[in-house]
Design a protein with these regions (language model features):
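Short, structured segments at the rim of ligand-binding sites
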Residues: 1-409
Length: 409
């Protein structure tokens, strides 16, 4: 789907959709719990649907209605047959579920599309293979995992995706003995691990932090839970930046006491308004990079984004696509080994950009359009369905002028 956006400032109230990060975690924990859990305020998307279908494949019963889900925890796992899980393009689903399936002893075949087959899982092939798991894996998808995961010591580098740590934190409490996750270097993306630990606690699972990582007691029991998913600061970031560029949007459904790392967007915007620039370590907030680059493009001085090298293996090479987004519209962005250098120009203009299938590039482009003088065309705008299917509906309700010009995909 290709769209045309005519520049206009946004104004009004938007109810920020539920956190995708928290929804993934609550759905998985509910599926592992004894009894019935009810989770409200879910923002359904392709990624969330992938996790729901994954847990169904492992034996959970999940019933969805509008923004709610009723989950009956896994009672009988399909151990006598191979389960097939389609992760679509969701890296969270893939990396969260691999350890869970192996902890349950379910032989599982994983499928995926887009760039997901190229996203690495070598941490698991190395560490899980030491603990009873066999991988039939040739650096692509589909692939199969089999065996029964055993407790023990898991050594994980801190500069890899926190999704690997989260996956282990889900799985290890199910095992018969205690386990240790030993971080062999500084843990990046720590806020995402904090979200995991916070959600696990709601379901009765206790994770003990140690000097070197985490101690996980075995034979713990997930308890059923009823609650709502809080709003997503990573999605809110687009509207916060739109405000910084001159819009007047009131944001609802956000928890000011949230442990979400992307809440840092507020602090960075304040710094930019005070100083005219920012220098952002994005090791803990990688999802903010595209919209931060948009913010920096309209600053007064050069801004830098660093410690973001993992963005090269997202839905797109997000460092490249972010730079292309801004440079194609008159900006000045240079790619470094681990981030971006953004120099403001007075030459920002309309034009045409490609989404490269990346939902965050589409939304960053839509925010950028509010500060341009000419129309912006976004090719492949349907990518927003990955995380925020109603983004353009909300955008229009706020006064955005968006028209579909082609349904090509």
């Amino acid at each position: 789907m290709n769209i045309k956006i005519n520049p206009t400032k946004l104004k009004g109230y938007v109810n920020i959709p539920a956190s995708k990060s928290i929804a993934h975690r609550m759905l998985i924990c509910s599926a592992l719990a004894n009894g019935k859990s009810i989770i409200g305020n879910i923002n359904y998307s392709k990624d969330i649907d992938a996790t729901i279908n994954a847990m169904k494949a492992l034996g959970a019963e999940i019933f969805t209605d509008k923004n709610n889900a009723e989950i009956n925890g896994i009672v009988h796992t399909p151990k006598n047959k191979k389960s097939v899980i389609d992760c679509n393009e969701s890296g969270s689903t893939l990396r969260f579920i691999i350890p869970v399936a192996t902890a349950l002893g379910v032989k599982t075949e994983f499928h995926g599309r887009g760039r997901l087959p190229q996203r690495p899982i070598d941490i698991y092939t190395r560490e899980l293979s030491k603990h009873g798991i066999t991988f039939d894996y040739n650096n692509t998808m589909p692939f199969t995992v089999s065996g029964q995961l055993s407790n023990g010591i898991y050594e994980i580098e801190g500069n890899v995706s926190s999704q690997f740590i989260t996956g282990l934190l889900f799985a290890l409490p199910l095992l018969n003995g205690d386990s240790e996750i030993v971080m062999t270097s500084h843990l990046e993306s720590r806020p995402y691990v904090d979200i995991t630990i916070d959600v696990l606690k709601k379901f009765g699972i206790i994770i003990e932090e140690t000097k070197k990582g985490f101690h996980v007691k075995g034979s713990q029991t997930y308890k059923a839970y009823r609650g709502n998913v809080e709003g997503d600061f990573s999605q809110a970031s687009f509207f916060y930046v739109a405000n910084a560029l001159g819009s007047s949007i009131t944001l609802g459904n956000l928890n000011t006491n949230s442990v979400q790392g992307d809440k840092k967007i507020i602090e960075i915007i304040n710094q930019t308004e005070q100083n005219g620039f920012f220098n952002a370590d994005c090791s803990d907030i990688p999802d903010l990079v595209p919209v931060l680059a948009v913010l920096a493009s309209f600053g007064k001085k050069t801004s830098t984004i660093y410690n973001a090298e993992r963005l090269k293996i997202k839905e797109s090479n997000r460092l490249e696509t972010t730079a292309e987004l801004i440079n194609n519209l008159g900006g000045d962005v240079k790619i470094t080994d681990d981030g971006l250098i953004i120099r403001p120009t007075n030459n920002m203009h309309g034009g045409t950009i490609e989404s490269s299938g990346d939902h965050r590039i589409v939304m960053a482009g839509a925010v950028m359009a509010t500060a341009l003088k000419e129309e912006l065309i976004i090719n492949g705008a349907e990518a927003v369905t990955k995380s925020y299917p109603d983004f353009f509906e909300d955008y229009k309700k706020l006064g955005g002028n968006v028209n579909v010009i082609s349904m090509e995909q």
